[in-house]
Amino acid sequence: MIKVVPKVLVMSGYGINCETETAHAFQKAGAETDIVHINDLIAGKKKMADYEIIMFPGGFSYGDDTGSGNAFANKIKNNLFDDLTEFINSGKLILGICNGFQVMTNLGLFALPSTDYGERISALESNTNNRYECRWVHIKENDSVCVFTKGINVTHVPIAHGEGRFYCDEKTYHELKENKQIVFSYCDSEGNPANGEYPLNPNGAYQDIAGICDKTGRIFGLMPHPERSLYSISEPEYQLKKEIAKRNGDIIPEFIENNLQIFKNAVEYFNK
């Protein structure tokens, strides 16, 4: 069987700043990547339909003016939403990280069984402490329908945001939970729920929610940055872990496998 190498459209422009590391993550997972400015899509120089995965990276699109991810989402709504809807209906994948999650939230891409694409069901509000949070956290994969997170339990990832507090109303929360659309929740290093406790839950997210997906499991967004934490050397405790491993005659693996697995799962989706 010939292995399919999916092509990833890594969105760029107007303050997005995580294109390179995001493209690198997909390349390490076995995909081909193109970093494409949104204006090239609007001008027709590149087409969403030519790709299998659309990636909305992190950053500060439009400087978070009018709210994080809002202006970039409006540019897509006004120019590319028909193309995006066609892409979704074709059964392909979309991933958004941090600002990308905020863009996708504003676009209304996390459809419930009771809603259509384009209907916004949640928000990502200012952190409870009204501070920009830049730290490492633990997140736990729930029993979800998300295709990106199979085989992952607890993983260690960095966050970097000022508006990452997930919020939805109680009715929406219960529908997300019942349909297994709550993908990642903040937790401690053992996988125990954060229960809103800072800094385990770094932003005050409702029900500790760090990431959700749409009703199909093919569209996924999260606030933490797995693409920034592929390598073990990036962890803040790396030198300590390295010394302990050395004394025990062990070697630290090159990759934080759970974080790389998110991108591998996307590639493997097209090889089932």
UniProtKB/Swiss-Prot annotation:
Its main location: cytoplasm. It is found in: Cytoplasm. GO terms for cellular component: cytoplasm. Keywords: ATP-binding, Cytoplasm, Glutamine amidotransferase, Hydrolase, Ligase, Nucleotide-binding, Purine biosynthesis. Pathway: Purine metabolism; IMP biosynthesis via de novo pathway; 5-amino-1-(5-phospho-D-ribosyl)imidazole from N(2)-formyl-N(1)-(5-phospho-D-ribosyl)glycinamide: step 1/2. SUPFAM superfamilies: Class I glutamine amidotransferase-like. The active site is at residues 98, 225, 227, 235. Its EC number is 6.3.5.3, 3.5.1.2. Part of the FGAM synthase complex composed of 1 PurL, 1 PurQ and 2 PurS subunits. This is Phosphoribosylformylglycinamidine synthase subunit PurQ. It comes from Methanococcus maripaludis (strain DSM 14266 / JCM 13030 / NBRC 101832 / S2 / LL). The gene is purQ.
